[in-house]
Amino acid sequence: MAKEKDTIRTEGVVTEALPNATFRVKLDSGPEILAYISGKMRMHYIRILPGDRVVVEITPYDPTRGRIVYRK
């Protein structure tokens, strides 16, 4: 993805778990996007389940995809 300063951080709720550590996330601002788990979360075995609140980074280049960076 893009550099840290180019990303948009927003919160949302995981609505569906898809194969290959991909999730469908409903953002607080309205749209639903596809998001994958960041490498550090994968490395530390942080589990994400439907219903979890997460922080997602989105690039301005493709606002339909994102990276989950934090689980609340």
Curated annotation (Swiss-Prot):
Protein's name according to its UniProt entry: Translation initiation factor IF-1
Recorded family membership: Belongs to the IF-1 family.
PROSITE patterns reported in the protein's UniProt record: S1_IF1_TYPE (PS50832)
Underlying gene: infA
Top-level taxon of origin: Bacteria
Localization, UniProt: Cytoplasm
Function: One of the essential components for the initiation of protein synthesis. Binds in the vicinity of the A-site. Stabilizes the binding of IF-2 and IF-3 on the 30S subunit to which N-formylmethionyl-tRNA(fMet) subsequently binds. Helps modulate mRNA selection, yielding the 30S pre-initiation complex (PIC). Upon addition of the 50S ribosomal subunit IF-1, IF-2 and IF-3 are released leaving the mature 70S translation initiation complex.
Gene Ontology molecular function: ribosome binding; rRNA binding; translation initiation factor activity
